[in-house]
Every structure is written in C-alpha cells, then in structure tokens.
Amino acid sequence: DLPWRRAECSTWGVMVSEFMLQQTPVKRVLPVWEEWMRRWPTPKDLAAEESAEAVRAWGRLGYPRRAQRLHAAAQAIVLEHHGDVPGTYEQLLALPGVGSYTAAAITSFAFGRRATVIDTNIRRVHARAISGKGLPNKSLNAAETRLAEALMPTDEQASCLWNAATMELGALVCTAKSPTCNICPIRHLCAWVAAGKPEAEYTPQGQSWHGTDRQLRGAMMAVLREAHHP
C-alpha cells in the first residue's frame, strides 16, 4: 500500500516518486518522498526553491542529479503548463529528466491512461514467463518492447492494473536472485518453470562503490546536507 499508488495521491506525487525510485529501493524512498511532499506539495512550491535545497533534501537516495532534474522539471511545469503536471506521454517526455520509462509510468500511474511501462521487474517477468529465460537481456531491445506492447491490455483501466501488477510480481515474487515460484500466481503458465528453470546467460553484477565517482559525490553530498546555505 504505497502512498503514491493511492487514488488520493496527486499527479505531482506520482511524478516525484518515479524520479526517486530510479535505481533506489522503495524502503529508502518512502521517508524522503513523504518529507518532499510535505515541503513541496506542488510543482510551484519546488520551483520557487533553490536547486541546491532540493539536492540537500534528496538526502541519501543517491544520484543527486535526479534532484536537480526534478527541480528543473518543476520549473518547466510552472512556466509551460501553468503549474499542472502535463497529461500526455509526449508532453511528459519533453520535461527535463524525464525519459521514456518515466513518461510512461506517470501516464499510467498518475493519469490512468494506457502506456507501456517497462522497468527491470517487468522485463524479468516477461523474460521468464514468456521467453523461458532466467533473466532478460542486459539492455532493453526492440523485441522486448514489442512483446510488452503486445501483452498490454487494450482497455485503459486494465492496462494500468497490468502495469502495476506485473511490476509488483517482479519486485516481490519473481526476483532476480531468489524467485519464490511456489507462490507465483502464474507458475503453471511460466515458460521458464516449464523448461526446468535454466540458468541465466549472465550473472547480475552489483555496482561498485569504493573508489568511484559515486563515492566521492556521496561524501560531498554529506557535507552539503550539513551546510546551512547553498
């Protein structure tokens, strides 16, 4: 029962969550999202703030450029859309920091419109259930996109439920390393299970941290968070 999936959540709240959830677990996002929505409940509120304050409030979510891009997107929404999050995929895609996945996710989850959402969890479910592979390809390709579009229900409401359900199935059940196939509702239809769960063609590698630019940025962000002024 995530707050950004509730019916009463604003379109802006959904947009903020999609920025924060990029490469960051839900449990880390939740408290930061709640604080952001308390401080900046509308794009206009964030747009009026200094960019450095947005970065500082990003906390330990990592990849702080997302905060800068979200701030820039808020300013664009105020200047170009009268302060309202735009409701079409094309308009969303034109905002700073919004790529194809984020635009599709906001279209589906915030506006209830049909859009093909393809994240890592959804790709993994498709790879196993339909293609019989242990893991999807390392990068999204045209064949995967066509498959996702073909599987998507044509009805708008059903398509939104499909996106959310498939994403949740991949996040909670059909996980990368320890899938719990015994409780999976589609295990009897799964091509990967039927094939005997063949090994994936590669092993997922975690991102290194020590000695990287990300570690340096993290240290700098810690200093910035303690500062009283940008």
Placement of each model-derived feature along the sequence:
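Catalytic cores of DNA base-excision repair glycosylases
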Residues: 1-214, 223-229
